Amino acid sequence: MFDVTLLILLGLAALGFISHNTTVAVSILVLIIVRVTPLNTFFPWIEKQGLTVGIIILTIGVMAPIASGSLPPSTLIHSFVNWKSLVAIAIGVFVSWLGGRGVTLMGSQPQLVAGLLVGTVLGVALFRGVPVGPLIAAGLVSLIIGKQ
């Protein structure tokens, strides 16, 4: 039996390898392994909790320098007096807000998810982006189409 989904995943993994983006390639290969093994029973959990687990792991990575002490408290304090750091804080707040809108939109309009995912995978694979794009992209879409 011909599995079109598997073929698409293999194509996306190949795109990840061709573009030297191991994040995309490894992620898709893990999903392929899950798909073709008895682990496929975990897909409902992955679909429901995967985004949350991914955000937790991403947050751990971002917060690690603070927790390890390699980013001293004095640097954090100085971020409130440097104009570039203040811009970074403002942009961080804005992007977090967009991501929140994106999560809401993806839940309320699942027909948009496919386009967001394809765009994100292409952005990650071709432009060396990172796969946080669907949430922010969905937030931007929500601003354009007027949905929360």
UniProtKB/Swiss-Prot annotation:
It is found in: Cell membrane. It is a multi-pass membrane protein. Keywords: Cell membrane, Membrane, Transmembrane, Transmembrane helix. One of its GO terms (cellular component) is plasma membrane. The chain crosses the membrane at residues 14-34, 51-71, 86-106, 121-141. It comes from the Bacteria. Belongs to the UPF0756 family. This is UPF0756 membrane protein CKO_01811.
